[in-house]
Amino acid sequence: VGGGGKTTLLYAMASHCAQKGWRVLVSTTTHILRPENGLWAKTDAEIQELWARGSYAVVGSPAPKGKLTAPPEADLAHWMAQADAVFLEADGAKHFPCKAPAEQEPVLLPQSNIVLAVAGLSALGHPLKECCFRLEQACMLLDVPPEACLTPELLAQLLASEQGGRKRVGSRAFYAVLNQADTPQR
């Protein structure tokens, strides 16, 4: 959940686990970019073929703009039961490095036992109105105006809040992931 490179992180983690010989499934409960590397599987046979090749399999129903949406619930449950590891993207951020969840977000499945809240460090030092998806919710949660610059403290508050990164986590394991740390300043 969150912003700042969820999909990239998801695919990197899936690749890492697949390289260990695990049967890895990637999907979404909302929308995700369709992979361009031939890893989108539409049938049981395609999933098994990808796993046999030592790759991960991405499942989902076609959606506009090169995306996938959640596959039918019964299909997803069937495929999840066959996998050693499952990675699900559970909300969207429109490519913003940070976000606050909407009323209906995140869409976590009961089977999910770990939640990662992702934020991009590229947002630090920028006004919320420039770097945060669902600006109104973020401003209310943080009690700051849209012009307020995102500080490490505000980002931590956003990630740790039960109305922010920890929303709907409940008793699941929770980790905050700070990415986009690819410059000396970050």
What residue ranges belong to the model's regions?
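Inter-motif core of Ras-like GTPase G domains
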Residues: 102-124, 141
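Phosphate-binding/switch loop-helix module in NTP-utilizing enzymes
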Residues: 61-100, 105
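N-terminal phosphate/diphosphate-binding loop that engages ATP/GTP or pyrophosphate donors
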Residues: 14-66
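Acidic, Ser/Thr-rich peripheral helices and adjacent loops at domain boundaries
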Residues: 44-47, 133-149
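Glycine-rich phosphate-binding P-loop
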Residues: 1-14, 18
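General beta-strand structural signal in soluble alpha/beta enzymes
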Residues: 1, 24-28, 58-61, 86-90, ...
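A short, acidic, amphipathic alpha-helical segment used as a generic capping/interface helix at domain edges
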Residues: 148-168
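G-domain G4 guanine-recognition motif of GTPases
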Residues: 90, 120-121, 141-147, 158-161, ...
